From Swiss-Prot:
UniProt keyword annotations, A-Z: Electron transport, Heme, Iron, Membrane, Metal-binding, Mitochondrion, Mitochondrion inner membrane, Respiratory chain, Transmembrane, Transmembrane helix, Transport, Ubiquinone
Subunit structure as annotated in this protein's UniProt entry: The cytochrome bc1 complex contains 11 subunits: 3 respiratory subunits (MT-CYB, CYC1 and UQCRFS1), 2 core proteins (UQCRC1 and UQCRC2) and 6 low-molecular weight proteins (UQCRH/QCR6, UQCRB/QCR7, UQCRQ/QCR8, UQCR10/QCR9, UQCR11/QCR10 and a cleavage product of UQCRFS1). This cytochrome bc1 complex then forms a dimer.
The organism of origin for this protein: Saguinus midas
Amino acids binding heme b b566: 97, 196
Other facts: Heme 1 (or BL or b562) is low-potential and absorbs at about 562 nm, and heme 2 (or BH or b566) is high-potential and absorbs at about 566 nm.
Protein name, entry field: Cytochrome b
Transmembrane residue ranges: 33-53, 77-98, 113-133, 178-198, 226-246, 288-308, 320-340, 347-367
Length: 379
């Protein structure tokens, strides 16, 4: 008799995706981050749901409702900090997942890569709107500054900003709609993640060597389910340690002050995971130019498959490109640091240099190194 997991309509889908899935036998721990991202999403939706039970999206009570959650709700402090730091671990996994995709040439799975980029944008939008909800100083001014960037769009900019605000400034209408979208977007992200997985299983996973995996595959369970659980333990260790020992390590002290439209904080900055893009935005003196650079810094991922000039999929055997890749990583870390610094010399100059390097490495240096390596293969 055939096992029900292979015949039952629902169990069959789960079986083909997580149990009997043919998986390359040589994939490393860099392939763990997909399942870790799924776990992060589940943690965020669960903790977010409990927070939404006690939160009020009104400018007069939002700040005090967050204080009420932290002080009066049973384990409210833990739920809140798990949610806040869960976002940080989510983005750490996200950046590592994208980095692995770039290094091992996973972007050649075009549909999977395109959906993944949309997932990144949706996650960034969700995180931004979530940051506005506690209605602290940085929430209010962050929302004001970032939404105001849309006013740089010719002709329709000002109308668009007022349409998003629901008035002439960031106020009750803005907070209510941000809460609405922040609540619904994670479920859209979950649906997109399912599509992402669907496209991935059409082609199968890549592997570190960059060669075809067809001749040598093993079932996902028990081999990789056990491996994923190990990664999950590390993730939970980091998240729980962060939540219990230093929950405010990654947050801004200004956000513990109630939003005040009459008092601007000395340094307006987003959460750490947006700092690289914020640094690129600030490095261009022109407003519209800055907004375009900000958009391009993320959307450039969409054109990466067209910039792939190498005859090899992976960077595993391409030493010149490897140097450029790790230079790009260092450049992104530099941009993240610069984004948190004041707009003054020498930070401005470093930020502008790092921004130019970011686009230069991706658009010209990596494709150029690929062409050089192709030539070297012939010698």
């Amino acid at each position: 008799m055939t096992s029900p997991r292979k015949t039952h309509p629902l169990a069959k889908i789960i079986n083909q995706s997580f149990i009997d899935l043919p998986t390359p036998s040589n994939i490393s721990s860099w392939w763990n981050f997909g399942s870790l991202l799924g776990t992060c999403l589940i943690i965020q939706i669960t903790t977010g749901l409990f927070l939404a039970m006690h939160y009020t999206s009104d400018t007069t009570t939002a700040f005090s409702s967050v204080a009420h959650i932290t002080r009066d709700v049973n384990y409210g402090w833990m739920i809140r900090y798990l949610h806040a730091n869960g976002a940080s671990t989510f983005f750490i996994c996200l950046f590592l997942h994208i980095g692995r995709g770039l290094y091992y040439g996973s972007f050649l799975f075009l549909k999977t890569w395109a959906v993944g980029t949309i997932l990144l944008l949706a996650t960034m939008a969700t995180a931004f709107m979530g940051y506005v909800l506690p209605w602290g100083q940085m929430s209010f001014w962050g929302a004001t500054v970032i939404t105001n960037l849309l006013s740089a769009i010719p002709y329709v900019g000002s109308d668009l900003v007022q349409w998003i605000w629901g008035g002439f400034s960031v106020d009750k209408a803005t907070l209510t709609r941000f809460f609405t979208f922040h609540f619904i977007l994670p479920f859209i992200i979950a649906a997109l993640a399912t599509i992402h997985l669907l496209f991935l299983h059409e082609t199968g996973s890549s592997n570190p060597s960059g060669m075809t995996s067809e001749p040598d595959k093993i079932p996902f369970h028990p081999y990789y389910s056990i491996k994923d659980i190990l990664g999950l333990m590390f993730l939970l260790l980091v998240l729980i340690s962060l939540t219990l020992f230093s929950p405010d390590l990654l947050t801004d002290p200004d956000n513990y002050t109630l939003a005040n439209p009459l008092n601007t904080p000395p340094h307006i900055k987003p959460e750490w995971y947006f700092l690289f893009a914020y640094a690129i935005l600030r490095s261009i003196p022109n407003k519209l130019g800055g907004v375009l650079a900000l958009m391009l810094s993320i959307l450039i991922l969409m054109i990466i498959p067209t910039l792939h000039m190498s005859k090899q999929q992976s960077m595993a055997f391409r030493p010149i490109t490897q140097i450029l890749f790790w230079t790009l990583v260092a450049d992104l870390l530099t941009l993240t640091w610069i984004g948190g610094q004041p707009v003054e010399y020498p930070y401005m100059t470093v930020g502008q240099t790092a921004s130019i390097m970011y686009f230069l490495i991706i658009i010209s240096l990596i494709p150029l190194s690929a062409l050089i390596e192709n030539k070297l293969l012939k010698w």
